[in-house]
Amino acid sequence: MTGANDTPYLLRAARGEILDRPPVWMMRQAGRYMKVYRDLRDKYPSFRERSENPDLAIEISLQPWRAFQPDGVIMFSDILTPLPGMGIPFDIVESKGPVIDPPIRTKEQVDNLRPLDPEESLPFIKTILQSLRQEVGNQSTVLGFVGSPWTLAAYAIEGKSSKNYAIIKSMAFSQPEILHSFLSKIADAIAIYVRYQIDCGAQVVQLFDSWAGQLSPQDYETFALPYQQQVVRQVKETHPDTPLILYISGSAGVLERMGQSGVDIVSVDWTVDMAEARQRLGRDMKVQGNIDPGVLFGSQDFIKARILDTVRKAGRGGHILNLGHGVLVGTPEDNVRCFFETAKQVDQLLAVPV
């Protein structure tokens, strides 16, 4: 049995242990705000290469670890990474984002999708996760991540990022049987992918349903929640002790429903006050978040004040400190350092109420 002190701090919190301070990491903590990342990107301009070449992905994942020592190290990857293994090719065009051509629009295309075999199509993921575990040891928790079915379907059906999601919503409201079939196939594939990440070394896995906040609560219950539950249920059948986190951008309208997904931790965006989020989700649900990424453009005193306010509102236990979205491009690295340093001193700066 591994002793508590041999278990990484974030993993202990994710399992429900009461600690002196909330663990801390940042979504997109490896990325364009860091000069070392930009230098590497200039040398290797293809995002697919940076995220699928193990040596590059490992190096990028470890850049913020070396700079700031976060309590979580998340593998550098993309939510679309498993799609080619299902028969959905994609590319990522710098400054434009993902492109899927041809997009998935017909029943025949959905029927022709193949089950995901990550050993065959995603072997680099094993190398990345195993290496990260080896590099950070028990000093940090290694996180994996996946896209949730609605968001992956939105990319695949729209063919690119979208502002209004008219094409997938058109399918949802005029040909729902095609969409439900597609969502179920994605859910099965993502459950396999999460299990694979855990088997390869991920200690916590975050599900990103980034675009589910674009759904009305009624449609969220029809097209997003059941497939989140399908993924979580299948993962928990085989890996019941691995904590799962769910993040949705613009989640204020569906926050309680996120708690119904079966995940262990709900990642709250900054549009909800953390005290209110705690009340709406109930004290038994652990939370993550939820500093506005824009706060990191403020003064360091302002950053510290916002961190203390959020931690105070979250209360003691069951909280992982994070942003309410990814780090923004152009964020000063010194302010990111201030964020992490303050977070690690929270217990001294603040008597956290029970």
Curated annotation (Swiss-Prot):
Presence of the UniProt keyword Cytoplasm in the record: yes
Xref: PROSITE patterns: UROD_1, UROD_2
Coiled-coil ranges (or none): none
Gene Ontology BP annotations: protoporphyrinogen IX biosynthetic process
Cellular compartments per GO CC: cytoplasm
Membrane spanning stretches: none
Main enzyme class: lyase
UniProt GO molecular function: uroporphyrinogen decarboxylase activity
Metabolic or biological pathway, per its Swiss-Prot or TrEMBL entry: Porphyrin-containing compound metabolism; protoporphyrin-IX biosynthesis; coproporphyrinogen-III from 5-aminolevulinate: step 4/4
Catalytic activity: uroporphyrinogen III + 4 H(+) = coproporphyrinogen III + 4 CO2
E.C. number(s) listed in UniProt: 4.1.1.37
Alphabetical keyword list: Cytoplasm, Decarboxylase, Lyase, Porphyrin biosynthesis
The protein's name: Uroporphyrinogen decarboxylase
Gene name linked to the record: hemE
